[in-house]
Amino acid sequence: MRQILITLSILLFSSLVFSSEKKLGNITYSNGANYKGELKDGIPNGLGFLSLPDGGKYVGEFKEGIINGQGTVTLSDGLKYSGEFKDGKKHGQGIYTYPTGEKYVGEFKDGKKHGQGTWTFSDGR
């Protein structure tokens, strides 16, 4: 009986561990967005690439289907943010680069510039 319980415990544990492994895959969303990258239980988790129908794109980390960690988002108009994300929003250190050549390097909180930062104009000032 003890041998059976040990065997069942090992099988149950190994199935839980292996069922949640990351795999590579593609997801096409109903709005036309397309995700390619690591999946855990069929959800973006880890490194991935998200292309949007309007031409925007995101390359970076996902956690449980949400943008989290380091990444870069580039919009179709050329606006670019590279830095930290939390719960799908810019949060932490990052760099905003505008199509005009202007740049903001600094802190973000809840998707907005917040805290210390440096603004550089397109002429270098």
Cite the ranges covered by each PLM segment:
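Conserved anchor residues at repeat-unit boundaries in beta-strand-based tandem repeats, strongest
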Residues: N34-N45, K57-N68, K80-H91, K103-H114, ...
